[in-house]
Amino acid sequence: MNYLKHKFYNLLTTIIVLFIFVLSGAIFLTFLGFGLYGLSRILIYFRLGDFTYNRSMYDNLLYYGSYIIFGYFIVFAVEHLMDYFRKMLPENAYFRGATFHLISYMVATTLFYFIIHLNYVYINIDFWVIMVIIGFLYVCKLQFYPESKNLNNRK
């Protein structure tokens, strides 16, 4: 009987944690969706972008969502690869300071444009607009998630 009590407690704890995870993920995706909808409206208003894919809600969600997910994957992969290079080559001048951030930003933007953006024919945004958007996001990442020491390393 005691075994069943602990099993129920573990199951209840798992369900609560899963509920919190799903709820926070849903809230994040909702805010992301509203933010991207607002960004697309701003780009359309200033004639900086054109979004001509207009099917059903789920088709639009899949098309534009995959654009965002693939773009995020490219930027994420470039950042981690550049961090890996910086750790492997600490004396190299290209992997220090502003030069490192400029190279990371340019590589991520260029790869995003040629690998992701050119394959989505219904999204028409100029390269310089993509550079400004990714540059703004990169500066926000540097501001809100600065490089810091690994606090888990104990000497």
Curated annotation (Swiss-Prot):
It comes from the Bacteria. Keywords: Cell membrane, Membrane, Transmembrane, Transmembrane helix, Transport. It is found in: Cell membrane. One of its GO terms (cellular component) is plasma membrane. The keyword Membrane applies. Involved in multidrug efflux. It is a multi-pass membrane protein. This is Multidrug resistance efflux pump SepA. Its main location: membrane. InterPro entries: SepA (IPR031396). The chain crosses the membrane at residues 15-35, 61-81, 98-118, 120-140. The keyword Transmembrane helix applies. Belongs to the multidrug resistance efflux pump SepA family. The gene is sepA.
